[in-house]
UniProtKB/Swiss-Prot annotation:
Binds 1 NAD(+) per subunit. Keywords: Cytoplasm, Histidine metabolism, Lyase, NAD. This is Urocanate hydratase. The keyword NAD applies. One of its GO terms (molecular function) is urocanate hydratase activity. InterPro entries: Urocanase, Urocanase-like, Urocanase_C, Urocanase_central_sf, Urocanase_CS, Urocanase_N, Urocanase_Rossmann-like, Urocanase_sf. GO terms for biological process: L-histidine catabolic process to glutamate and formamide; L-histidine catabolic process to glutamate and formate. It comes from the Bacteria.
Length: 557
């Protein structure tokens, strides 16, 4: 029997200003869905896998074809419903309603675990959407680069006087998310040694200029890191190996990195983490014929790696969990102090979330990189005093290779996002841009996620696991007129550990789009300020007052 999730065809998004659908509001999700499966974007496009273990864009290839066909015929007063990657219905709504509403991998809490999900997955009854895979707004490794850069810069501020020159970062994983780490480290001024078990992933990062060099030798990797740091150079190297083996070996040798983290796909113990002593080929085969053995061995190996990370932490080296739930896996394997070192959000990012600042991103549907150059210039024009952001845009232009449709990630917050959206829409209207653009974000944002081991770890009021907030975010973005809205479960940290929402809005140059953009790009980050203000963060409370938010039970207005 053929595998409905495997097909050797090559998918790439259309370019240019000619429509394949009835309007840009349906052309936009069509192009972004196809862009998610571009071979220059996706991790395993022939299997519909975009990134993050088994994060898919559609449930099966038949479902992909049905979604494409439906989007091509969808009217501007209709909404397509997508249930875990399957197009299940089209309903009459209105022109300001979303054209697509997506729900991926959501399970009733008692059954929200990998065992139950995997059973459904085998029967083609569910699909793991990760965050931006199943919501059709993945832009390649760039999508996480700036967030990783901001994290490393803040770590440098807190621990090394704001200067990472001559320092180096140890990490693991060069997949769709982890692949951003070497480039982010170099942009922040540090060297990076990234351990990756799958050589094809390291080669992908070499090809797209996210990592500088590759080796199979730990000794060679350490020698290069030593030479670069002594010379004050910021460069990166991928070491082909298993993080569960390399991290303890470095501890044993007494090697002391300046920062330690990890972005292996530890959230998925079957598909995301190579067990100690296994070959990649053996691992891939046993994922299909003996997944329980894979999970058992992977979890035991994660415990070994986290123990090494604890050893680094106890030696005084700044060490953080980068949101893959590896500490939780180690805790469940009996490592009682697995959470002794913090996650990256409470350690470095939460003050940004308090002001609604997060991973704002946009993509040029024209396919022309010049459209991104023009929008970069517009960001600088509208935010003239944000020199940190200008520096980021300059580095991004120089260092980041586009994957698929040209795109840009740019962390901005409440008060700025809607201004940029309106300006971009005006650029489409007056012909400065060759075609419309879409604006979206990661689900990792200030008001759109509940994830107690990542984005909402150690909330001030103890509300880490309250998931009303992403539900409200999705509802508000739907009411505000986003072009498509998604509500997912399990992204980043795995089944049972997160709920999160996403939105994308199309700048098609119309006055109707102006009104939608102003609502969506104000309300979306405002929910993040509201959520953090409700938790008692002074920065969020002050920002809510400054921006004039009406929060009756929080501000009494």
């Amino acid at each position: 029997m053929s595998n409905p999730r495997h097909n050797e065809r090559e998918v790439r998004s259309p370019r240019g200003d000619e429509l394949n659908a009835k309007s840009w509001l349906t052309e936009a999700p069509l192009r972004m869905l196809m862009n998610n499966l571009d071979p220059d974007v996706a991790e395993r496009p022939h299997e519909l896998v975009v990134y993050g273990g088994i994060g898919r864009a559609a449930r099966t290839w038949d479902d992909f074809d049905r979604i494409v066909a439906t989007l091509k015929t969808l009217n501007d007063d209709e909404t397509l419903l997508v249930q875990s990657g399957k197009p299940v219905g089209v309903f009459r709504t209105h022109k300001d309603a979303p054209r697509v509403l997506i729900a991926n991998s959501n399970l009733v809490p008692h059954w929200a675990n990998w065992d139950h999900f995997n059973e459904l997955d085998k029967k083609d009854l569910a699909m793991y959407g990760q965050m931006t895979a199943g919501s059709w707004i993945y832009i390649g490794a760039q999508g996480i680069v700036q967030g990783t850069y901001e994290t490393f810069v803040e770590a440098g501020r807190q621990h090394y006087g704001g200067n990472l020159k001559g320092r180096w970062i140890l990490t693991g994983g060069l997949g769709g998310m982890g692949g951003a780490q070497p480039l982010a480290a170099v942009m922040a001024g540090a060297c990076c040694l990234a351990v990756e078990c799958d050589e094809t992933r390291a080669d992908f990062r070499l090809r797209t200029r996210y990592v500088d060099e590759k080796t199979h030798s730990l000794d060679e990797a350490l020698a290069k890191i030593d030479a670069w740091t002594k010379a004050g150079e910021a460069k990166s190297i991928a070491l082909i190996g298993n993080a569960a083996e390399i991290f303890p070996e470095l501890v044993k040798r007494g090697v002391k990195p300046d920062i330690v983290t990890d972005q292996t796909s530890a959230h998925d113990p079957v598909h995301g983490y190579l067990p100690l002593g296994w070959t990649v080929a053996e691992w891939r085969a046993k994922q299909e014929n003996d997944p329980k053995a894979v999970e058992k061995a992977a979890r035991a190996s994660m415990k070994v790696q986290v123990q090494a990370m604890l050893d680094f932490w106890n030696a005084g080296i700044p060490t953080v969990d980068y949101g893959n739930n590896i500490r939780q896996m180690a805790l469940e394997e009996g490592l009682e102090n697995a959470f002794a070192f913090p996650g990256f959000v409470p350690a470095y990012i939460r003050p940004l979330f308090c002001r609604g600042i997060g991973p704002f991103r946009w993509a040029a549907l024209s396919g022309d990189p010049e459209d991104i150059a023009k929008t970069d210039a517009k960001v600088k024009e509208l935010l003239p005093d944000n020199k940190h952001l200008h520096n980021w845009l300059d580095m991004a232009k120089e260092r980041i290779a586009f994957q698929g449709l040209p795109a840009r990630i740019c962390w901005v917050g409440l008060g700025d996002r809607h201004r940029l959206g309106l300006a971009f829409n005006e650029m489409v209207r007056n012909g400065e841009l060759k075609a419309p653009i879409v604006i979206g974000r990661d689900h990792l944002d200030s008001g759109s996620v509940a994830s107690p081991n990542r984005e909402t770890e150690a909330m001030k009021d103890g509300s880490d696991a309250v998931s009303d907030w992403p539900l409200l975010n999705a509802l508000l973005n739907t009411a505000s007129g986003a072009t498509w809205v998604s509500l997912h479960h399990g992204g980043g940290v795995g089944m049972g550990f997160s709920q999160h929402a996403g939105m994308v809005i199309c700048c098609d140059g119309t006055e109707d789009a102006d009104r939608r953009l102003e609502r969506v790009l104000w309300n979306d980050p405002a929910t993040g300020v509201m959520r953090h203000a409700d938790a008692g963060y002074d920065i969020a409370l002050d920002w809510a007052r400054k921006q004039g938010l009406r929060l009756p039970a929080i501000l009494g207005n």
